[in-house]
Swiss-Prot record:
Pfam families: Rhomboid (PF01694). Its main location: plastid. It is found in: Plastid, Chloroplast inner membrane. This is Rhomboid-like protein 11, chloroplastic. Its EC number is 3.4.21.-. It comes from Arabidopsis thaliana. Residues 104-117, 176-178, 265-280 are chloroplast intermembrane. It is a multi-pass membrane protein. SUPFAM superfamilies: Rhomboid-like (SSF144091).
Length: 280
């Protein structure tokens, strides 16, 4: 039995039963650098300068968004037409106060050619003889007034309406007899028509054809409305006769509108100045 144990010990040497590792201090010495003067390792937070950061995008990823932003910037902001509705409401209010409620002193807003007050040249553009006269003027006032306001803004609309209306009344006062009375926005309507045509006009045969057809329609309708107000042609207010058709006001209103556009074209617009500054 002792011989068997002795043989077993000989067949299984001690070196085969153990896993030998180098000592810990030797492993550290082997892994550490030979230069003992090198400072120990220090852990620093990860920092990257901005100049080292580069982002790469493909053109297909960035171009569509750029084009969308550019289209939004170039899109013309839409202007809400509010001034024309205020002008229409003022005309309606004065008509109701004159013909329905018969407010005392409302007829002092008419333009009496014999001895006119300075404000009557303005207020007469908001007065009308009857409903046919008012409804026809308001129809074309809305169409052409909205066109002018979309291009020139609220202030431009009021300036055009008052300038052409006052100009038409002034020419009528100079030409018509002294016992005449002038009311109506027909002069301002023709003035707004001329301004809208000149502002939006482009030298295209389609646009010219539209202007000719629409201009003839406007003239006919306004003349019919003026003829429809013939019921007041013989009405006398303290020795004054209300004129039926004021052709002078119609033509002078359109002429004043042309003059207004010509005068405004002499002044550079704010948008042109901004474009020049941006380009420089």
């Amino acid at each position: 039995m002792s011989q068997l144990l002795h043989l077993h010990r000989l067949s299984l040497p001690q070196s085969s039963l153990r896993f030998r590792f180098p000592p810990l201090h030797r492993r550290r010495a082997a892994s550490s650098p030979t230069n003992s003067t090198q400072p120990p390792l220090q852990f620093r937070p990860l920092t990257v300068s901005r100049s080292q950061i580069t982002c790469r995008f493909s053109q297909s990823d960035i171009t569509p968004q750029f084009e969308l932003d550019k289209a939004k910037d170039n899109r013309k902001p839409q202007k809400r037409a509010n001034g024309i509705f205020w002008i229409i409401l003022i005309n309606l209010g004065i008509y109701l106060a004159d013909h329905f409620f018969q407010v005392r002193g409302i007829k002092s807003l008419y333009l009496y050619h014999n001895f006119p007050a300075w404000y009557q040249f303005v207020t007469a553009t908001f007065c009308h003889a009857n409903w046919n006269h008012l409804s026809s003027n308001l129809f074309f006032l809305y169409i052409f007034g909205k066109l002018v306001e979309e291009e020139e803004g609220n202030f431009g609309l009021w300036l055009s309406y008052l300038f052409t209306g006052v100009g038409a009344n002034l020419v009528s006062w100079l030409v018509l007899p002294r016992n005449a009375v002038s009311v109506g926005a027909s002069g301002a309507v023709f003035g707004l028509f001329a301004i809208s045509v000149l502002v939006k006009m482009s030298w295209d045969w389609r646009k010219i054809l539209e202007v000719l057809i629409l201009g003839q329609f406007v003239i006919e309708r306004v003349m019919e409305a003026a003829q429809a107000s013939a019921g007041l042609s013989g009405t006398i207010y303290g020795g004054y006769s209300l004129q039926t058709v004021n052709h002078i006001a119609h033509l002078s209103g359109a002429l004043v509108g042309v003059v207004l556009v010509w005068l405004l074209s002499k002044f550079p617009s704010a948008s042109m100045d901004q474009d020049v500054k941006k380009s420089s």
